[in-house]
Amino acid sequence: MEQTLSIIKPDAVAKNVVGKIIDRFESNGLKVAAAKRLQLSRADAEQFYAVHKERPFFKDLVDFMVSGPVVAMVLEGENAVLKNRDLMGATDPKKAAPGTIRADFADSIDANAVHGSDSLENAKIEIAFFFSGREIN
């Protein structure tokens, strides 16, 4: 069964829509195999998003991700990576299709409610960043 990482970002946690977002995943065939609420340190956020280090938005992204708690989850199901990305919608909520998580819960391209792995290979790396094998079931 395929697994992917989802992070509910500080903006969505602050709005108390964590349960609504998890319901979207579960009602679309994705099981929450592991979950934890945590506060990312600046070092953690910089390491997690290191692939974007040279991009102009990197500092703002890190600042945002450490601005409040997040909920990291391992989602499991058939085609989990693609299904999660479809449910999230476009990175910019203004361009996200109606009924997607970002269209319904995100405010801007920066405060866009959720992160999801973009490939199976990256999902494995991202899951290992947050979870040990014994935490996933």
Curated annotation (Swiss-Prot):
For activity, the cofactor(s) needed are:
Mg(2+)
The Gene Ontology terms for molecular function here are:
ATP binding; metal ion binding; nucleoside diphosphate kinase activity
GO-annotated cellular components: cytoplasm
Q: Which UniProt keywords apply?
A: ATP-binding, Cytoplasm, Kinase, Magnesium, Metal-binding, Nucleotide metabolism, Nucleotide-binding, Phosphoprotein, Transferase
Q: What is its EC number?
A: 2.7.4.6
Catalytic activity of the protein: a 2'-deoxyribonucleoside 5'-diphosphate + ATP = a 2'-deoxyribonucleoside 5'-triphosphate + ADP; a ribonucleoside 5'-diphosphate + ATP = a ribonucleoside 5'-triphosphate + ADP
Residues bound to ATP are K9, F57, R85, T91, R102, N112
Please name the GO terms of the biological process aspect recorded for this protein, alphabetically: CTP biosynthetic process; GTP biosynthetic process; UTP biosynthetic process
**Which residues constitute the catalytic centre?**
H115
Subcellular localization is given as: Cytoplasm
Q: Which family does it belong to?
A: Belongs to the NDK family.
The cross-references to HAMAP family, in alphabetical order and at most eight, read: NDP_kinase
Summarizing the function annotation, the protein's role is: Major role in the synthesis of nucleoside triphosphates other than ATP. The ATP gamma phosphate is transferred to the NDP beta phosphate via a ping-pong mechanism, using a phosphorylated active-site intermediate.
**Subunit note:** Homotetramer.
Q: Which NCBIfam families match?
A: PRK00668.1
- What's the protein here called? Nucleoside diphosphate kinase
Tell me what organism the protein belongs to. Answer: Wolinella succinogenes (strain ATCC 29543 / DSM 1740 / CCUG 13145 / JCM 31913 / LMG 7466 / NCTC 11488 / FDC 602W) (Vibrio succinogenes)
Q: Which gene encodes it?
A: ndk
